Every structure is written in C-alpha cells, then in structure tokens.
C-alpha cells in the first residue's frame, strides 16, 4: 500500500498579518563582528616600498574552530599519615572517569543535538586521536546521568505548574523491539518527551503526574468521574471511604478490590474511569493549574480545559476528495471562510473585546451550520460544529495558541532520532534519549546554547553559569 503525504495546510501561513511598514525585501543582516569576542589578534606585515607612509590597519575577522586531543596526566599527591594511613589528593571538579568534561560534553552535544549515530561518533572521535570504542561511548551517553534525568523531570513539573496552556502531540517510537509511542508536552518555555507502550488517556494522565506516583480522590477527581458518567453508587463507595490518597499502583488496585469495584458489571468500566479520575486528582493536587491543553483532537488528550488545533481542523476540509465542479467550489468557499475566520481569531487574541467575542461566536455558527449540498462536507461541518467549545476556547482564553505547530516542531527531533537509530534497547537508554532531547528543546526556547548548558553542568573551566532550567521557566512564566 502506498501512502501519499499531503502537505500541511496553508491556513496558518495565509492568515499571518504582515507588520506595518514591512515589505517583501529580505532584511539585511547586522554586523557579524559586533557579535563576536576576539580571542587573538595577529598583525600582518607588508613589505612596503620606499617612500610609503604607515596608515594603520585594516581589520579582517576570521572565525575558526580548534579541535584537538588534549591528554592530561593528573599526578595526585599521596601523603602517609602519622597513624600509618594514606591520603591522596582529590581530582578536580568535573573529572569523572578517564574521559574529561569537554569530551563528555562533545559526545552528548553531537549525539542528541547533532543527531549523530554512535558508530559515526566513534569514527569521528578516533579521527581526532581519541582512543575510544563503541561501548565506552554508550556508557558516556547513559551512565551517571541522574542529574540530567532529574532536571528534565523538574523541568516538566515547573512547566506544568506555571503554564497557562500547553500543547501536546505524539508519534511512534520503538523500544525493546516493540512499537510504542512518544508523547510531547510543552509550551513556549519548555518541552518534555516521554516514551511508553500506550497512547491511552490513562497513559497521558500518568505522564501529567510528572513522576509522582500517587492516586488522589479529591473534588477534581470526583468531578472527572461524574463527567465520564461513572455510576453514582461507584462514586459513593469512593467518597465514603476515609482514605483519599494512595501511593503506588498496587495500593490503589488493592483499594479498588477492597471496595469491590472490579467485580461490578457496569458501563463505562468502573476501574478505568475511577483510575483516570484518581490520576487527574493527583495531577491537580500537585499544582497543575487551570491550564488549557491544546491538541489535534486525539481522544486521549481530552482532559480538563481542552482546546483544539485550528490547522488540524481545517486540514480535514482540505483533504476532502471533491469529484465535481460544484463540490470543489463548495469546498473552496468553506476553506476561504475558515481562513478569514482564523485570521480574525488571531486578531482577537491581540485585542480581545466582549463585542468581538459575541460577533465571532455568531459567525462560527453561520460557517459551520451552513448546508453546501456537498454531503461529505456538510457532515464534516456538523462534526466540527460539535467541537465548538474547544475550537472557540481562545475567546475565553486569548493567551492560548490556535494551533499545535509548536508540538509538531518539537517532536520532529524524536522522528529524526527514530529514523537514524531505530529504537532503544534499555529503559535507561530510553529515559536518557527522552530527557536530553527535551533539554535540548527547552534550552532553545529559553535562548540558552545547549553547548553552554552542558559546559556548566560538567564544570568545564571558563564556562558561564547556567541556573537550573526549572527556575528559569518559572521566572519566564511570571514575567509579562
């Protein structure tokens, strides 16, 4: 079977307003020299003819890169104590094993940010004169990375606790020769990835817990269960029990068994809905605010305040097959109306008013309740009209985006990694890949060079100090 890829909708690009005074001419780049710090100055001599007068210098700045092997033999002093014991001088900060901080920094940057494969990285290092093998490179990538894994987890917690909105997406991922899924969560300040074997709503709620392992029965959990139409007598059993917090899946399952919930024959599945509710209660209990989750309409992401991506919604109209001139004309008309409406939604985000909100709601109804005579298109418009609260979430929350382009851009690095290296074979390898790719994207969003970030974390001499990323995220979220 051949699958033809349809290009992305031009909805987003077509409705981007040009700034006042802008033109189609390319903007000239600024001076490169002003952005550079000079490391070395060389004077170039000239054999001047007799009678010439010296008139100073003409500067010509050249950027270069110095890559060379640097082997250090640390001779640590040893002293014998009066009691017969021996003391040895400690190595400098940043020295951990027989490969120095600069080499470890280079390996992580090339593999995660440069998307290199391990064999090619080994070949490159050997060409520099480094004596290293594939197994040693793998150890540099996955061993003793607890600090980075913790910072990636804390980045997610800081991002979720301070976010007015997040966008989410997922893609396929291979782990231990089994198909799985990688979920992206992020916004303008952070990005995080998590690879699991499922893409269910239960899985998404577990990811939103950001490493916490508890199940909580609180007001938010009960509201979720009622929204999902869980039987009232099942909710009553959970409410009547005095214990409301359970640490670990075993404790939660034991609690459900004690209440006799798994044995109930009701619809929807009481265990699944109760577990989802307890997970949602845990998410809210750990500081998840009234955040809007913007998605592409995948069912697993429909929790809490939920908004939909307009680009994905319009793409459904764009992808319809029209076989007659009348159908094509109807399709083009609807797409044009949606484009214009989308542009006005973007303008509303910049200057929201109550009057414009009312007008846009009425205009939405006119567009998505129209009958075109193109049956497939009419059914699609009815389907989109049913999503009115999610599509018009921006009217009540103007700060949220109208699309999930940010998530799609972020998750491309996972797709590239999958194509380059297929999949992971160990849990620590999977966790390190997800954590470092998330840190790479987060650094880019915070305008921090990943190379500088690694230099600070590996205590490379002369590197600038980089504060913990979660602190920067919280500070950015508080700033206007």
Name these PLM-found stretches.
Residues 66-164, 440-442:
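Short, positively charged, Gly/Tyr-enriched micro-motifs
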Residues 93, 108-110, 122, 321-353:
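Conserved catalytic alpha/beta cores of large enzymes that bind or transform nucleotide phosphates
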Residues 1-98, 168, 214-274, 283:
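Short, flexible loop/hinge motifs at secondary-structure junctions
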Residues 245-269, 288, 292-303, 332-480:
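Acidic/histidine-rich catalytic cores and adjacent linkers
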Residues 166, 275-280, 393-397:
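Flexible, glycine/threonine-enriched loop-and-boundary segments that flank and lead into catalytic domains
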Residues 177-334:
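Catalytic nucleotidyl-transfer cores of nucleotide-processing enzymes
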Residues 162-175, 295:
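Two-metal-ion RNase H-like nuclease active-site motif
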Residues 1, 48, 81, 107, ...:
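Mobile genetic element proteins and their domesticated derivatives, centered on retroelements
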């Amino acid at each position: 079977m051949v699958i033809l890829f349809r290009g992305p909708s031009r909805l987003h690009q077509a409705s981007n307003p040009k700034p006042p005074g802008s033109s189609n001419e390319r903007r000239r780049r600024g001076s490169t020299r002003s952005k550079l710090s000079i490391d070395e100055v060389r004077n170039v001599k000239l054999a001047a003819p007799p009678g010439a007068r010296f008139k100073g210098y003409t500067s010509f700045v050249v950027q270069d890169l110095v890559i060379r092997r640097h082997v250090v033999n640390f001779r640590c002093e040893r002293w014998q104590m009066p009691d017969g014991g021996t003391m040895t001088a400690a190595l400098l900060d940043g020295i951990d094993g027989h490969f120095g901080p600069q080499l470890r920094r280079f390996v992580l940057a090339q593999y995660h940010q440069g998307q290199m494969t391990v064999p090619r990285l080994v070949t490159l290092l050997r060409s520099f004169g480094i004596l290293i093998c594939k197994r040693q490179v793998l150890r540099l990538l996955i061993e003793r990375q607890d600090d980075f894994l913790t910072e990636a987890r804390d980045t997610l917690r800081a991002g979720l606790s301070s976010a007015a909105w997040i966008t989410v997406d997922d893609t396929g991922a291979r782990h231990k020769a089994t198909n799985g899924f990688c979920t992206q969560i992020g916004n303008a300040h952070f990005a995080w990835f998590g690879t699991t074997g499922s893409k269910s709503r239960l899985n998404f709620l577990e990811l939103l817990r950001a490493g916490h392992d508890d199940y909580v029965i609180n007001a938010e959990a009960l509201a979720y269960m009622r929204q999902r139409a869980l039987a009232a007598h099942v909710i009553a059993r959970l409410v009547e029990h005095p214990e409301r917090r359970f640490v670990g899946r075993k404790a939660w399952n034991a609690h459900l068994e004690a209440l006799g919930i798994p044995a109930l024959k009701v619809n929807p599945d009481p265990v699944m809905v109760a577990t989802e509710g307890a997970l949602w209660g845990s998410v809210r209990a750990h500081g998840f605010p009234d955040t809007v989750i913007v998605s592409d309409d995948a069912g697993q992401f429909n929790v809490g305040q939920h908004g939909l991506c307009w680009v994905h919604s319009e793409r459904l109209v764009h992808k319809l097959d029209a076989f007659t001139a009348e159908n094509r004309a109807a399709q083009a008309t609807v797409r044009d109306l949606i484009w214009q409406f989308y542009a006005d939604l973007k303008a509303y985000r910049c200057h929201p008013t109550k009057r414009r909100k009312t007008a846009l709601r009425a205009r939405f109804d006119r567009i998505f309740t129209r009958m075109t005579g193109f049956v497939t298109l009419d059914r699609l418009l009815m389907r989109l009209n049913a999503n009115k609260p999610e599509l018009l979430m921006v009217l009540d929350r103007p700060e949220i985006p109208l699309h999930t382009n940010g998530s799609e851009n972020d998750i491309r690095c996972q797709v590239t990694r999958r194509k380059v290296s297929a999949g992971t074979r160990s849990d620590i390898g999977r966790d390190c890949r997800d954590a470092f790719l998330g840190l790479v994207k987060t650094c880019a969003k915070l305008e921090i060079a990943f190379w500088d970030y690694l230099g600070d974390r590996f205590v490379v001499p002369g590197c600038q100090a980089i504060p913990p990323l979660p602190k920067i995220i919280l500070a950015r979220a508080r700033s206007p």
